[in-house]
Amino acid sequence: MLIAIVGKPGVGKTSLLQYLKDNYHFSVFYADSFIHEQYQKNNPGYQLIMDHFGKEFVNQTEVDRKKLANYVFSDDKLIEKLSLVTKPLLIAWIKSLKTQFQKKLALIEIAVMLNYWNEYRSLFDYVIKLERDDQLVNLALQQRNSHKKVKDLIKEPNCKIDTIFNNDSIATAALKLIKLLETFLERNKCRCDCCHIQ
């Protein structure tokens, strides 16, 4: 069973999934990390960036992510282009995880899904959106020196999504998420041992 974890930058998606992995032994995956792996030389993402954006955005070993980010953040059309270029890689990866986790539970952080709902939604059994007060989001983005435009990259969904608010401790958010996952498993009447939450 694949569960998508979505939300705007700075809401704590990565921290929450890491906490669940460390403390509850969940299988967790990160779309951004997958794409970063694909940006290594001899991987498909490296060639795609070179083909679609030019040789100036790659070096001897990998895509120059900082240079690429500075370039694409200057224009919404370039952000869209980058997403379209990497989308086939992401979809193939998610499909392989779907096969691998047919009888297991896995959480995948994929913020960009909210911008391409129709392409990604059918790949997941459930979607959970993480939200946080704006003041906490701004603080989180400042602490990691994120580009100012990052906050607005992810669109608000135009449909109802199960939502968890991450305004307290990460442990509190984790317990909320686990409770929601338990309702999903009950809804699916999942009986396999590997899907039970410990």
UniProtKB/Swiss-Prot annotation:
EC number: 2.7.1.24
Localization per Swiss-Prot or TrEMBL: Cytoplasm
Residue sites binding ATP per the record: G10, V11, G12, K13, T14, S15
This protein's pathway: Cofactor biosynthesis; coenzyme A biosynthesis; CoA from (R)-pantothenate: step 5/5
GO MF term list: ATP binding; dephospho-CoA kinase activity
Tree of life domain: Bacteria
Gene3D superfamilies for the chain: P-loop containing nucleotide triphosphate hydrolases
Catalytic activity field: 3'-dephospho-CoA + ATP = ADP + CoA + H(+)
Listed GO CC annotations: cytoplasm
Ranges of residues in domain DPCK: 2-90
GO BP annotations, alphabetical order: coenzyme A biosynthetic process
Cross-referenced PROSITE patterns: DPCK
Pfam families xrefs: CoaE
Keywords: ATP-binding, Coenzyme A biosynthesis, Cytoplasm, Kinase, Nucleotide-binding, Transferase
Summary of the function given for this chain in its UniProt record: Catalyzes the phosphorylation of the 3'-hydroxyl group of dephosphocoenzyme A to form coenzyme A.
Family according to the record: Belongs to the CoaE family.
Name of the protein described by the UniProt record: Dephospho-CoA kinase
Organism of derivation: Mycoplasma genitalium (strain ATCC 33530 / DSM 19775 / NCTC 10195 / G37) (Mycoplasmoides genitalium)
Lineage, highest ranks first: Bacteria, Bacillati, Mycoplasmatota, Mycoplasmoidales, Mycoplasmoidaceae
Designated gene of the protein: coaE
